[in-house]
């Protein structure tokens, strides 16, 4: 028998590993249900759209953008010197690292 022909015995199939899917799976499992969670991955993996391509990446980029205004406004408060330059590659790398960390948090919630 190959994996495609295998029979699965579960009480609940949760489709999607976003916040709601992970919560539903955990709540059911805590009550003794045998749970299978199906997550296709792709753009929105564990944690769902908000964590992977929506809310969290947007907030990270928005937060980074506000620093430019803060550096500019700091001159009026006695700060001197040139504002640092944005390293776009590093910002993207840090975003990827934070999303990987959050995906790991969701994975730990399931095991």
Predicted regions and their residues:
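Residue-level detector of alpha-helix initiation sites
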Residues: 18-22, 45
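Glycine-rich flavin
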Residues: 2-3, 8-9, 27-33, 37-111
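Glycine-rich Rossmann-fold phosphate-binding loop(s) that bind the pyrophosphate
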Residues: 16-19, 40
């Amino acid at each position: 028998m190959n994996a495609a022909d295998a029979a699965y015995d579960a009480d609940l199939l949760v489709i999607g590993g976003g916040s709601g899917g992970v919560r539903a799976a955990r709540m059911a499992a805590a009550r003794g249900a045998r749970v299978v969670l199906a997550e296709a991955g792709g753009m929105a993996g564990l944690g769902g759209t908000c964590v992977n391509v929506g809310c969290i990446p947007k907030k990270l980029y928005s937060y980074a953008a506000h620093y430019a205004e803060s550096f500019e406004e700091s001159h009026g408060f006695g700060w001197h010197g040139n504002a640092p330059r944005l390293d776009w590659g590093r910002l993207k790398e840090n975003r990827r690292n934070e999303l990987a960390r959050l995906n790991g948090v969701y994975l730990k919630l399931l095991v």
